[in-house]
Regions:
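Classical Sec-dependent N-terminal signal peptides that target proteins to the secretory pathway
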Residues: 1-12
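Long, amphipathic alpha-helical surface segments
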Residues: 12-48, 61-66, 73-89, 114-169
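Surface-exposed patches in mature extracellular/periplasmic domains of secreted proteins
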Residues: 48-53, 92-102, 140
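Short, glycine/acidic-enriched capping/hinge loops at junctions between secondary-structure elements
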Residues: 52-54, 67-70
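Early exported N-terminus immediately downstream of N-terminal targeting peptides
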Residues: 53-57, 61
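Short N-proximal segments of mature Sec-exported proteins
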Residues: 100-114
Length: 169
């Protein structure tokens, strides 16, 4: 009896009431791209406690030398920090146009210089392809799922989700 009740509730929630898709039908795609990026980062980063995850706090914000955090952040403070960090990264990748948000989300996780290159790291193949105007970047984006040379399934899932939510062909 309980199973039947649960099934009918689920069926009622999935039954459309008119011809246009509802907010529930669209899910995360109903949000603007920046909001999708924020929600994706929050989901995959998880909450960082200052005592256990120093120098990271909130949803993966790296504490900078001039920042003084003595206790945990509120969710609102962490949300503000995340949005600020992501906005700065979007500005850093602005010249890449429609790929700037996708690159910013990747840089939030791996660091901008693994993508842009510097003295320690060469410019990524992903960025080289984007600069040449090539759009087959999925494989190169998914290559950022390695840690110590091994492909990590959870990171690969994150990259695949990023692509589904933010990649514009």
């Amino acid at each position: 009896m309980l199973l039947f009740l649960c099934q009918s509730i689920v069926a009622q929630n999935k039954t459309p009431t008119n011809d246009s898709p509802s907010q529930n039908d669209l899910g995360i795609f109903a949000f603007p791209p920046f909001e999708r990026a924020v929600r994706c980062i929050k989901y995959y980063e998880g909450w960082h406690d200052i005592k256990r995850n120093y120098p990271y706090i909130g949803w993966g914000h790296r504490i900078l030398p001039h920042e003084k955090f003595k206790k945990n952040l509120t969710y609102q403070q962490a949300n503000t920090l995340l949005r600020s960090d992501l906005t700065k990264l979007c500005a850093m990748f602005r010249k890449y146009g429609k790929d700037s948000l996708l690159l910013a989300v990747l840089a939030y996780n791996v660091g901008p210089y693994k993508i842009l290159g510097n003295k320690r790291f060469p410019k990524s193949r992903l960025l080289q392809k984007i600069e040449r105007g090539l759009r087959d970047i999925e494989k190169d984006y998914l290559d950022f799922c390695r840690w110590r040379g091994k492909c990590i399934p959870s990171i690969k899932r994150r990259r695949m989700t990023d692509l589904q939510l933010l990649y514009i062909p």
